[in-house]
Amino acid sequence: MKRFINCTLVAVMAIAVLIPGIAFAEFPEKPITYTIPFNPGGESDVTARLQEPELERDLGVAVNVTHKPGGGGAVAWSEFQRTAKPDGYSIIGCNIPHIIGQPLIRKDAGYKTDGFKIIMWFHFTPNVLVVSKDSPYKTLDDFIAYAKANPKAATVGGSGTYSANHLETLRFEKAAGVKLTYVPHTGTGPVIPALMGGHITGAMSYSMVGVSYKDKLRTLAVASEERVPALPDVPTFKELGYDIVGGAFRGVAAPLGTPQPIVDRLAKAYTDANKIISKKQLDLGFVMTYATGDDALKLVEKMRAAYSDVLSDIQKTKK
């Protein structure tokens, strides 16, 4: 009898190996925690709220969106890599270039760029330079003229340190020949009241901000190859003579070691959700992407190369 049971167990295990995903056919069976590493109100949060009902419909379980801001995402990412179980029930929002720049520049970042199992990169938002509507700076040239005449006096807020906003500010300084003072915030959400309250001169933020706050803010330039359809009257930096193109790719990741069938199931759910919410996202100034699997990894490497110069400059100044 014992021999029969052992043989049966071996046979079942063999079938599970031969038929990938058989052990995960029931995933998911309980609620999923979707952590956003920034404050509510920013692009990551807005997107997660649009995704949430579509994901729940697709997966058949609750998807609980939580927030853990701090360190431009580093607080949540480091905790996730330390503690999240690779079972698909803990997933987290990820941003490029944040996850590339922070571990390279900060010795204490607490996480590794390659320490995530990327499920999908689902959209991109180009950076924009914005000022308040009552600002004396009507154009990018106005802003640059002030910054040149008053080195370090112009304060530029943004989401996090060594984030897309921060790195774009550094690239802008170099391209325009100015010295600015960058003021990091825990996400896009807190940047807006700081700008409208007059606590900072301007903000290097994202296209969604230019669209959502067009009645309260003035967008001076957008860091895209072409004008953003949702901001048709805003010139690109390139149009104005500054070769600056960049922004944030956003996506979602699971812990390393998460079984591929689970990752594939989540990727399908996010892909389907992306298609459903795309119109709303496009209207807010987002550019939709659908990078999964090898394409997701290639995107990380492509952007690592794109930001190599500015990251190298930062490393030199820190030595």
What are these regions (language model features)?
Residues M208-N274, K302-A305, T317-K319:
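C-terminal lobe and pocket-closing loops
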Residues A25-D114, K152-A154, T161, K174-M204, ...:
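N-terminal (or domain-start) structured segment
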Residues M13-L18:
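Hydrophobic core
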